[in-house]
Regions:
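Acidic, metal/cofactor-coordinating or nucleic-acid-engaging core segments within structured domains
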Residues: 137-139, 143-152
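Generic structural signal for hydrophobic core residues of well-folded globular domains
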Residues: 110-111, 145, 252
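Compositionally biased, low-complexity/repeat regions
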Residues: 17-30, 36, 44, 49, ...
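Long alpha-helical repeat solenoid scaffolds
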Residues: 133, 263-266
Length: 267
């Protein structure tokens, strides 16, 4: 592995590209997050529709219950929890209501540019082992790049943890503030938001695209969101009921049958 990694570096076999955006953002309703074009917070550039856990909870020792979580819980509400859908932006401004100033980041990274060409050379030489090793290392480099960029965002670009000083072990254990949930993972299992994310970031300009099945190309790529809330942690949405499916279909303005196909693993 180390020998192959050195060849990748010295031979410049792979190219790494990334794009990141930081946007004013607020929770809309209970479960959704709106990313806005500017600080006026009136023009959404992306709406991230959220799913909430629906598990039946057992009481804790003190009689309390753990909440059923949604990623939107970690973003400040629009208009200080007034109903953004019921009020126009002009009416809200007239009453002096302002949304809390929160933000959400979006990112996409790839280290897979060049993999296909080199893999084809290995396969032409019947060297399946190195073809597999190359792809595996490219995948690991993509994860490392995502970690490196997240650190840059926390300490500089967004800067909410400018004084962060963590050891490599602490970084691996994710002891930093904030999370970077990726579409398709347990906390946000809906892959379809990748379409809006890729369009917003213009990922095609850095060589990243989506397949019809919403897989990223090159394969050695990572994309997702940044949430900076100090209490934000990862969780598994798990199974949801038809009531939540129907509610999301209405919010998204899409056919329930189409959404059912997208969320089949969680139904």
């Amino acid at each position: 592995g180390q020998a192959m990694l050195q060849k990748i570096i010295t031979g410049r076999w792979l190219q790494a590209n990334a794009v990141v955006g930081l946007y004013p953002a607020n929770r809309v309703g209970d479960d959704d997050i709106a990313l806005y074009a500017d600080e006026a917070r009136t023009t959404p550039v992306l709406t991230w529709y959220g799913l909430r856990q629906q598990a039946t909870r057992e009481a804790e020792d003190d009689g309390s219950y753990r909440p059923n979580r949604c990623l939107a819980d970690y973003v400040a509400p629009a208009q200080n929890a007034t109903d953004i859908e019921a009020d126009s932006a002009d009416e809200s401004r007239a009453r002096g209501q302002k949304s809390l100033q929160d933000y959400v980041g979006v990112f996409a990274v790839t280290t897979g540019l060049g993999v296909n060409k080199k893999e084809a050379q290995f396969l032409a030489a019947h060297d399946d082992y190195n073809a597999i090793l190359l792809k595996a290392l490219a995948d690991r480099l993509a994860e490392a790049f995502a970690e490196c960029l997240h650190h840059k965002v926390r300490t500089d670009l967004w800067g909410y943890a400018a004084g962060e000083q963590l050891s490599p072990d602490d970084l691996i254990r994710e002891k930093y503030r904030g999370i970077r949930p990726a579409p398709g993972y347990p906390a946000c299992p809906d892959h379809s938001v990748k379409r809006d994310l890729f369009a917003l970031l213009q990922c095609d300009e850095i060589g990243m695209t989506l397949t019809e099945s919403l897989a990223m190309a090159p394969a050695a790529s990572v994309s997702g969101f940044y949430i900076g809330h100090p209490n934000a942690t990862y969780f598994n949405v798990g199974r949801i009921g038809d009531d939540q499916l129907q509610d999301m279909a209405q919010r998204r303005g899409m056919a329930e049958a189409d959404l059912r196909r997208l969320l089949a693993p969680n139904l």
